[in-house]
Amino acid sequence: MVDEIIKSMQSKMDKTVDALKKDFGTIRTGKANPMMVEDVRVDYYGTLTPLNQLGKIACPEPRVILITPFEKGMLKDIEKAIFAASLGLTPNNDGSSIRINIPELTGERRKELAKVVKQKAEEKKVAIRNIRRDANDELKKHQSEMSQDEVKGHQDKIQKITDSYIAKLGDLEKEKEKEITTL
């Protein structure tokens, strides 16, 4: 029973860490990253479809994203969708693929992005703490079936797991901030 609570908690925390990685992937750092555009929704025969399902997204150079659609007829729609997504990126349609040159970040923009990184990391840390609270609440429901020492031991275990996930988020945050602030 306690193992199930901990397993469920770790699963939720893993998803939270993955969500932060995904959030960070969408933040423009001056380097090309396919994650910047892969979730852009394109009108594909009346259905809004993620760009990564309509073509191959690659980064042939450090500051270039190359999108090669599976259907050449989709080039105009993909171009429109990238403009509509307000990513601050300018797609160049060469007739067979779309190239996006990633401009250098200004010092001011780097500071803004560093703040966004801190904010997103803090949101996920709060989510991790909420997951911990839920796990402790679940543990309290089964308190009558255990001794106080067992309950305390399980709470300590939950806290150690929480601390390790908070540290993971902190590492991801530092890594992304370094990526943004490095010229």
Curated annotation (Swiss-Prot):
Q: Name one GO molecular function term.
A: ribosomal large subunit binding
Pfam name, any one: RRF
Compartments where found: Cytoplasm
Keyword Metal-binding assigned: no
Q: Which UniProt keywords apply?
A: Cytoplasm, Protein biosynthesis
A cellular-component GO term for this protein: cytoplasm
Q: Region labeled Disordered — which residues?
A: 134-156
- Where is it mainly found? cytoplasm
Q: Name one GO biological process term.
A: translational termination
- What HAMAP family has UniProt attached to this entry? RRF
Function as written in the Swiss-Prot or TrEMBL entry? Responsible for the release of ribosomes from messenger RNA at the termination of protein biosynthesis. May increase the efficiency of translation by recycling ribosomes from one round of translation to another.
**UniProt similarity note:** Belongs to the RRF family.
Put simply, this protein is called: Ribosome-recycling factor
Q: Encoded by which gene? A: frr
